[in-house]
């Protein structure tokens, strides 16, 4: 019975002897158990451990063999090219091997990916684009009025000239505040003839309105005395006109723009 067991284990032992450095020795406790009890579990435990060790050794050997196999037999897919000169220099033990290998790699990369030439140096400085005048570009800080606006709206000088001719009976001191208000509303006249419109002050708007109301009240207080002195009447209805004609008084003249503009909010920009 022992002879049969020994003959059965001989091929496995021979296989294990072929890899003495890879296989592990069988546990020493398994031999006396196997010899003492041939049919006991100790023999099977030792044989299974031996098979496990053999499988590990064979797997490691196969993996090592596949890893060391020549790359030419595996094909060109997924295989890196081996630099033979670098391998020879590494085998000889020279220190210049890494530098030569890097130079070879750089040459290969330059061949596969050609390096582009650098852009030419900029010799001429880029000049800005020539802009038009501010009047054409409409970006001037002082807006320029067109000829149509000049034609429709008279200048402040013309308005001042027309005011005394339209109302010759009104003295000059009464027309001065109106001219100053017109100047403020219309804007300042520049030396080149352009009119710069004044920007309305929205913050101090209430104070400006109060000052305008005071000016109009002053003119109202002064205007009735002038009208009564000159014989004018405020109401120009047909009845009043007939009565004034019967009394022999001269017919009332046409009301000027200054009288029409008198009100809670005088519009000094409209000239009739």
UniProtKB/Swiss-Prot annotation:
Modified residues (Phosphoserine): 222-223, 249, 258
Keywords noted in UniProt: Phosphoprotein
Composition bias, Basic and acidic residues: 202-220
The organism's place on the tree of life at top rank: Eukaryota
Disordered: annotated segments: 1-47, 111-130, 147-272
Comp. bias (Polar residues): 1-17, 155-165
Protein name from the UniProt record: Uncharacterized protein C1orf226
Organism, scientific name: Homo sapiens
